[in-house]
Amino acid sequence: MTLIAAHHLAVRRGRDEILSDVSLSVAPREIVTIVGPNGSGKSTLLRALLGILPAAAGRVSRRPGLRIGYVPQRLQVDGTLPLTAARFLSLPRRRAPAEVAAALERVGVPEVADRQLADLSGGQFQRVLLARALLTEPELLMLDEPTQGLDQPGEAAFYRLIEEVRSTTGAAILMVSHDLHVVMAASDRVICLNRHVCCEGTPRVVSNAPEYRALFGHGTQGALALYRHEHDHDHTHDHSHHA
């Protein structure tokens, strides 16, 4: 069963075609990562799937009643506003303190509840955004470059957290990666986008695809770098595609 799909989707901005003939789908519990150069339409694709941007051609289909959690690429917060993390999670819908505390605990930052958003580190703020998205109990979690601005340990830790979210909640993940050569080892599929779908498949298949190499060069021997980590639990998905 498909949760969300694009069918020959095109998106235009004025006379410019940002996306052309894009088709993709996300199944339950699947982790799909979208990579592409700057200006390739990655963020536009997420916004079109969410219904924020209209389709110039083609269409988007969603399973009826699908609950989606969204972590945007950038969220500017006025540093002069007194807004704690706990209060932020209660906007616009008021949440019980216990619910807010549980959400922050779930993403590993229970200590930031009473801290001002402006005082949080980049990694802490991204986790607060994730906590907010998870409050809707999403069946599909959409993340737009969620690790941008994080250092490598912070990036790896956030990816581990995303895997844990999928494992514990069963949510599917559709994520845009800002780093052309870094993709989660847990990704079931990688979609290479440059205004259209250049290629897609497992991380290993995409890293060896001529379309990927033509776009991004050989970089780290032309291969996508895959974050790996030791597991003390079983996943139902296959990790055998580690590079």
UniProtKB/Swiss-Prot annotation:
It is an enzyme of class 7 (translocase). InterPro entries: AAA+_ATPase, ABC_transporter-like_ATP-bd, ABC_transporter-like_CS, Metal_Ion_Import_ABC, P-loop_NTPase. Keywords: ATP-binding, Cell inner membrane, Cell membrane, Ion transport, Membrane, Nucleotide-binding, Translocase, Transport, Zinc, Zinc transport. Residues 4-219 form the ABC transporter domain. It is a peripheral membrane protein. GO terms for molecular function: ABC-type zinc transporter activity; ATP binding; ATP hydrolysis activity. One of its GO terms (cellular component) is plasma membrane. One of its GO terms (biological process) is response to zinc ion. CDD domains: ABC_Metallic_Cations. This is Zinc import ATP-binding protein ZnuC. It comes from Cereibacter sphaeroides (strain ATCC 17023 / DSM 158 / JCM 6121 / CCUG 31486 / LMG 2827 / NBRC 12203 / NCIMB 8253 / ATH 2.4.1.) (Rhodobacter sphaeroides). The lineage of its organism: Bacteria, Pseudomonadati, Pseudomonadota, Alphaproteobacteria, Rhodobacterales.
